Amino acid sequence: QTFLDDLAKYTGVTVKPFFAADYAGIIEGMRFGKVHVAWFGNKSAMVAVDRSGGEIFAQTIAKDGTEGYYSLLIAHKDSPLNSLADVLKCDKSLNFGNGDPNSTSGFLVPSFYVWAKNNQTPDKCFKRVLTSNHSGNALAVANKKVDVATNNTENIYARLAKTNPKAFKNIKE
């Protein structure tokens, strides 16, 4: 709420939050005039520009000057998975949390760097493949509902560590 209050004060406009389960919902909200400002990753931002007339006007920069964020594969801290090679055994024994199809870090980047570059797909490798947003994937890993999932550094280190430290302590990259 603090961010919304600050934004309203700075712009002089009443700011109302809009919630959706995924990027597609936010993009459609923009398309129909329900959303005027949103935070997207690269892929969803491009879709918002194409489908909703959005404009890209800012980029995240950390206090240390680091630009953007990075895609991750995460597992429970007690998991025997410690490397990409462990994940790519593809023996259909594991459950996988895939990201929102409109997410750069949760779907697009892993689709290329993990799956395409290794001539694999999640469906060939895992017993079950579930699709969720970053928060859902983090909680699924922390609660051992999936064995490995996609995520990103911004969601894990900037959000989850602050909003749910117990879950954060149960996750490793």
Language-model-detected regions and their locations in the chain:
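Extracellular/periplasmic catalytic domains that process cell-envelope and extracellular macromolecules
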Residues: 31, 48-50, 65-68, 89-91, ...
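Bilobed "Venus flytrap"/periplasmic-binding protein-like clamshell domains
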Residues: 1-10, 20, 43, 64-139, ...
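Generic structural signal for residues in well-ordered beta-strands
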Residues: 15-17, 128, 171-173
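Short beta-strand-centered segments that line the small-molecule binding cleft or hinge
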Residues: 37-38, 46-69
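A ligand-binding cleft/hinge motif common to bilobed small-molecule-binding domains
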Residues: 41-53, 113-116, 140-143, 147-171
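Extracytoplasmic small-molecule ligand-binding "clamshell" domains
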Residues: 1-46
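Periplasmic-binding protein-like
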Residues: 62-72, 162-173
